[in-house]
A protein has these predicted regions:
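RNA substrate-binding interface of SAM-dependent RNA methyltransferases
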Residues: 31, 38, 89-176
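Short, structured interface segments
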Residues: 79-89
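Amphipathic alpha-helical repeat scaffolds
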Residues: 18, 104-112, 223-229
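Short acidic-hydrophobic, aromatic-tinged amphipathic segments that line or gate anion-handling sites
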Residues: 16, 61-66, 149-159, 213
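N-terminal positively charged helical leader segments and presequences
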Residues: 1-81
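Structured adenosyl-cofactor binding patch, chiefly the S-adenosyl-L-methionine
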Residues: 23, 28, 82, 117-119, ...
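Short beta->alpha connector loops at strand-helix junctions that form conserved
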Residues: 65-66, 101, 127-128, 150, ...
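Active-site/ligand-binding-proximal alpha/beta "capping" segment
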Residues: 171-222
Length: 242
């Protein structure tokens, strides 16, 4: 087997650090899983036996690789990692979408992926410049949810819009916005929630592309964390009865 490098964006593979993310990779993308790395001290830890069983079932090689795990995770307490081939998906045109415009934090993106999956959204788009979807930090923050989602990265928002021209857009921003509780009442069958960069938010032109939405809060805070705002928005739109 070829040696493994510390993660770089130009590699054709990446890592899913952690026992649970590794299991998610094996369960939902077994054809993309190249091998599984396990720490010598992982024996007896919750999930280790199941991870080995899943690897055996998928015909994936399991290796003991303490040094490699420390190198790719940057931590000494990483007990497993799946090595997987990067993949491409297309969002389902009939399903609800979430678009993240220029997100800059891997932890936020991973959290949003996990939240989206948990609330029933399986289609996500990222607009460049943005975090690396396959960075192990993103994969780990998603707790492996990435492997159950259809995620595509676009160079421009216009590219996404041209691919899905018949969708109602809901950019989360203050300009020309209505409260979230009002926006969900007119939710059509096909819709997309759009969230901006952690620091800059969405450019002003997004207000004219759809119905701008705001999450109302009291005056004691000036804004909400991107992951929290996305979670609130996704929850309200998914739980509202059309």
């Amino acid at each position: 087997m070829p040696s493994l490098s510390a993660y770089k964006s130009d590699l054709d593979y990446s890592y899913a650090p952690g026992i649970f993310p590794s299991m998610e990779c094996l369960m939902h993308r077994p054809e993309k899983t190249r091998r599984v790395l396990i720490h010598s001290s992982a024996a007896g830890r919750e999930g280790t036996d199941r991870l080995r069983t899943l690897a055996d079932k998928a015909g994936v090689r399991v290796e003991e690789a303490d040094r490699v795990l420390a190198r790719i995770s940057g931590k000494e307490n990483c007990y497993a990692a799946a090595v997987f081939e990067k993949f491409k998906d297309e969002p389902d045109p009939e399903k609800p979408h979430v678009v993240l415009h220029n997100p800059g934090d891997s932890g936020n993106v991973g959290t949003i992926l996990r939240t989206a999956l948990g609330l029933g959204i399986e289609d996500v788009a990222l607009i460049r410049p943005c975090v690396d979807l396959f960075d192990p930090k993103t994969v780990r923050a998603s707790m492996g949810s990435l492997f159950q989602l259809r995620v595509k990265v676009y160079d421009r928002f216009q590219d996404y819009r041209e691919a899905f021209p018949d969708r109602a857009l809901y950019p989360f921003m203050l300009d020309a916005s209505v409260p979230l509780q009002e926006a969900v009442k007119t939710r059509p069958e096909k819709w997309t929630l759009i969230f901006g960069n952690e620091g800059k938010g969405l450019p002003k032109e997004f207000a004219s592309m759809g119905q701008a939405v705001r999450i109302e809060s009291n005056e004691k805070v000036d804004s909400l964390n991107l992951g929290i705002a996305a979670g609130i928005g996704i929850y309200q739109f998914m739980m509202h009865e059309a």
